[in-house]
């Protein structure tokens, strides 16, 4: 999945219950989330619990996170909405 041309649907950070406020509760910024969504080396999958698409990768600060998101529009432009993001252990191979 290539999201480099996707638009990201962020709420206002000061709005209670916003997606940007929610990721901040996990110690992440929108820039870190976007660095994974748009980054090289990102792995995509589907969440077992929610059925939503997920992206695993390293942030610009080097943290390994998962981003759970919804696809709002599959046409051009692709629009995605981050639901949550949090740090996870990096898989060992």
Where are these regions (language model features)?
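Ribonuclease/tRNase effector modules and their secretory precursors
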Residues: 1-93
């Amino acid at each position: 999945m290539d999201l480099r041309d996707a638009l990201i649907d962020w709420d206002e950070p000061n709005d209670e219950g916003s997606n940007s406020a929610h990721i901040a509760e996990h110690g992440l910024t929108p820039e870190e989330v976007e660095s994974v969504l748009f980054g090289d080396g990102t792995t995509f999958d589907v969440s077992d619990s929610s059925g939503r698409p997920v992206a695993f990768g390293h942030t610009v600060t080097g943290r390994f996170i998962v981003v759970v998101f919804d696809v709002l529009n599959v046409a051009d432009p692709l629009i995605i909405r981050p639901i949550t993001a949090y740090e996870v252990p990096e898989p060992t191979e």
